[in-house]
Amino acid sequence: MFTLPYYLPQNLNKCIISESKTLEKNSLIYAQGEKPKEFYFLKQGLVGLYHSLENGKETLTRLYHANEYFGFRTIFSETSYHCSAKVLMEADIVRIFPGNHANFIANNPDFSCYLMKQLSNELLMQNTE
């Protein structure tokens, strides 16, 4: 697996960043079908993404560990969440509200490159599994 050095939220420009919030195991962060307003940085803990089928069955699609971002794929694609995010181990989470997406990307070029590398590595890993 590829490991990228993580990029701290406090280094982001022209966006609103929440204080870290501790969420207990089984807490719902966001639900499948909701429209996103923010994305997240996991300071510590474990978060799972679950996709629900029409028959009610849930499938774990991805795990996020400490120092990873999640929820950004959906917010930048301007769609609804395709999965629900749930806390699997007590987690400290920072919410990031980017506002205008084009401005956020322009004001955070290093972070934008970081996210592109993360997406590229995830695609590469999916193609080799």
Curated annotation (Swiss-Prot):
Name this polypeptide is given: Uncharacterized protein HI_0804
One Pfam family this sequence matches: cNMP_binding
Source organism per UniProt: Haemophilus influenzae (strain ATCC 51907 / DSM 11121 / KW20 / Rd)
Superkingdom of source: Bacteria
Cross-referenced PROSITE patterns: CNMP_BINDING_3
